Amino acid sequence: KLFIYHCDASNENDVNDLFDKINKKTSKIDALINNVGISGPTGTIDKLNSFDWENTLKVNVISHFYFTKNAIPLLKKNKGGSIINLSSGAGIMGFPLRSPYAASKWAIVGVTKTLAMELGKFKIRVNAICPGTIKGDRMVRVIRDKAKFLKVSKKSVEKEFVSMASMNCWIFEEDIAKMCS
């Protein structure tokens, strides 16, 4: 069965309330897909403010903690399952002008590796997906902001992002969904 709920993923009380609702509907789950994230600010670290840094980490990393903490007991009751954390290519290589985003995605990779070691004995698989450039509204903003910061064309920034992908092409949301299924 699939249940759909809405909550503020960066608010621990909202996530806890969400899992209270889930616990009333079912005693176990098969999988958790942590796909919460924001792009965060663009710029050199000396030009960024602490609010944007902290907010990027809160949404991109701490929200995963809230969901994972609540999901683990349900996965254990199921005697196994899967946690899939969405990270980014920025979580495995440097990402100039995007340090808060990169830091958050590296954190997700580190937590994923740690949880895989901790939860394997419960038959809970934990993996990260680290896609390249995903076509969508978020990337439109990231490209715009980077082009503005560097004073170059959006087209040149777009080419740069696409060239970083191993297949030199855009990744689409549907591709990510297929990886999770």
Question: How would you label these PLM feature ranges?
Answer:
Residues S88:
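Residue(s) in the substrate-gating loop at a strand-loop-helix junction
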Residues G43-I45, N49-E54, F161:
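Substrate-binding pocket helix/loop in short-chain dehydrogenase/reductase
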Residues T68, S104, T112:
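Active-site helix of classical SDR
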Residues P73, M117-K121:
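Alpha-helical segment proximal to the catalytic Tyr-Lys
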Residues H6-D17, S50:
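The beta1-alpha1 cofactor-binding region of Rossmann-like NAD(H)/NADP(H)-dependent oxidoreductases
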Residues A128, V152-S181:
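C-terminal helical subdomain
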Residues I45-D46, M93-S99, K121-F122, N168:
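Active-site loop immediately N-terminal to the catalytic Tyr-X3-Lys motif
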